[in-house]
UniProtKB/Swiss-Prot annotation:
Necessary for normal cell division and for the maintenance of normal septation. Mg(2+) binds at residues 42, 64. The keyword RNA-binding does not apply. This is Probable GTP-binding protein EngB. Keywords: Cell cycle, Cell division, GTP-binding, Magnesium, Metal-binding, Nucleotide-binding, Septation. The keyword Transcription does not apply. GO terms for molecular function: GTP binding; metal ion binding. The gene is engB. It holds the Pfam family MMR_HSR1. Its cofactor is Mg(2+). GTP binds at residues 35-42, 62-66, 80-83, 147-150, 180-182. Residues 27-201 form the EngB-type G domain.
Length: 205
């Protein structure tokens, strides 16, 4: 397989969908981004694409209730899934989101990988683990990004990464763990390299 390097700065908004049934047809390759409502998902997407307002960041966690799709190249899509786990969201809506997320991860044929974002200071909450379980049971590779890494010293950061790497061993899936900071540009290159790898079958000669 030839090594590719996509230009994520060219990424543009494609469409929004209220639920999985409304997502455009199941073609090409999609990579999904998931995380708790305050994990910094939109910020990470904006840092990857070097666009301040590509994914709207909200002062109110849980605001992203739509599934947002972005196109990097024709047939190469990034999918921003609704943030989960925010206390102020009505219980019924939370249950609906979780059902929809599980359905998407397990049934979407063109889904090639899942990026789960977690605050490095509070990783592996119940819903994060649920996302990883769904992905592993669907044989979906996972990149765990420990966001807001700039909030910790380098030694504390390394300790957290090591702890999470050990904690995920029982999942027995294809899971990579990296520290990430949009502010200090930590881990953006690793994120781009993983996305390139997941998209590469489209460009295989």
């Amino acid at each position: 397989m030839s090594e590719i390097k996509l230009n994520y700065h060219k990424t543009h908004f494609l469409t929004s969908a209220p639920n999985i049934r409304s997502i455009p047809e199941d073609t090409g390759i999609e990579i999904a981004f998931a995380g708790r409502s305050n994990a910094g998902k939109s910020t990470a997407l904006n840092a990857l694409t070097n666009q301040k307002n590509l994914a709207r960041t909200s002062k109110t966690p849980g605001r992203t209730q739509l599934i947002n799709l972005f196109e990097v190249e024709p047939n190469c899509k990034l999918v921003d899934l609704p943030g989960y786990g925010y206390a102020a969201v009505p219980e019924q809506m939370k249950i609906q989101w979780q059902k929809s997320l599980g359905e998407y991860l397990q049934k979407r044929e063109c889904l090639a990988g899942l990026v789960v974002l977690m605050d490095i200071r509070h990783p592996l909450k119940d819903l994060d683990q649920q996302m990883i379980e769904w992905a592993v049971s669907a044989n979906l590779p996972v990149l765990l990004l420990l966001t807001k890494a700039d909030k910790l010293s380098q030694s504390a950061r390394s300790k957290q990464v090591k702890m999470v790497r050990e904690a995920i061993l029982p999942f027995q899936g294809d899971i990579q763990v990296e520290a990430f900071s949009a502010q200090n540009k930590i881990g953006i290159d690793k994120l781009a390299a993983k996305l390139d790898f997941w998209f590469s079958p489209l460009f295989a000669k």
